[in-house]
Amino acid sequence: MAVISMKQLLEAGVHFGHQTRRWNPKMKKYIFTERNGIYIIDLQKTVKLVDAAYDYMKNVAEEGGVALFVGTKKQAQEAIKDEAIRAGQYYVNHRWLGGTLTNWDTIQKRIARLKKINAMEEDGTFEVLPKKEVAGLNKERERLEKFLGGIADMPRIPDVMYIVDPRKERIAVQEAHKLNIPIVAMVDTNCDPDEIDVVIPSNDDAIRAVKLITAKMADAFIEGNQGEDQATEELFVEETPEATSIEEIVDVVEGNNESAE
């Protein structure tokens, strides 16, 4: 029983890759065909690989692991934050600060500063400070919250990273490699799959595609933490005889194209 259906993937535009002139040849095995200068991702493979990614994330959760969701492109920011929070995990959805993981001690000092400013507001310190100083502290807090708020309570270096568009998040990928942190990622036709431990071939530019896949990874973590006996039926879908086949995809490619130009 698959965690995601071909129909769901199709409706979210997961099959639309990049223009053929913007591709990584290593993605060839995940490509079904080309239409109108756009590569079409093989959704039969995506269905199976989403299952593999789901199981991987679930296993990490079952072992008490920590997950970091990363996606700083505009199309991913909302889903990354919302789904990480829903799963009780952590996220980076604005610019990745170099050393976020490889210089964890320094980052922890900045997080401590963020928490100190929050405490100053809560304990009434703000009320006795000059307005100009309070304004400066609020500005500092806003910046710290923007870049570090999603990892402020992360107890340690994560046990797995889920990344939307590893090509854009190359610094995060490099840091994960240095620290031997496994990566699960949405990988579009212009990415290098060899850099990723668990590949999910997918359009990483369509908001609906990002939300669909990211939600499934959050579902996996939730199930892993709850135990399978408590998992909701909605986490899984069964293919019906009417489910969209990969051949039918070609017929709709000329319609709603949400790939990156």
Curated annotation (Swiss-Prot):
Is the keyword Mitochondrion assigned to this protein? no
What GO molecular functions are on record for this protein?
A: structural constituent of ribosome
Sorted alphabetically, which CDD domains does this protein's record hold? RPS2
Q: Which GO terms describe its biological process?
A: translation
Q: Which UniProt keywords apply?
A: Ribonucleoprotein, Ribosomal protein
Which InterPro entries does this chain map to?
Ribosomal_uS2 (IPR001865), Ribosomal_uS2_bac/mit/plastid (IPR005706), Ribosomal_uS2_CS (IPR018130), Ribosomal_uS2_flav_dom_sf (IPR023591)
Entry's Gene Ontology cellular component terms: cytosolic small ribosomal subunit
Record-linked Pfam families: Ribosomal_S2 (PF00318)
Q: Please indicate which superkingdom the organism of origin belongs to.
A: Bacteria
Q: Is this entry keyworded Magnesium? A: no
NCBIfam families per UniProt: rpsB_bact (TIGR01011)
Q: Which family does it belong to?
A: Belongs to the universal ribosomal protein uS2 family.
This chain's protein is named: Small ribosomal subunit protein uS2
Question: Which organism is this protein's natural source?
Answer: Enterococcus faecalis (strain ATCC 700802 / V583)
| Gene transcribed to yield this protein | rpsB
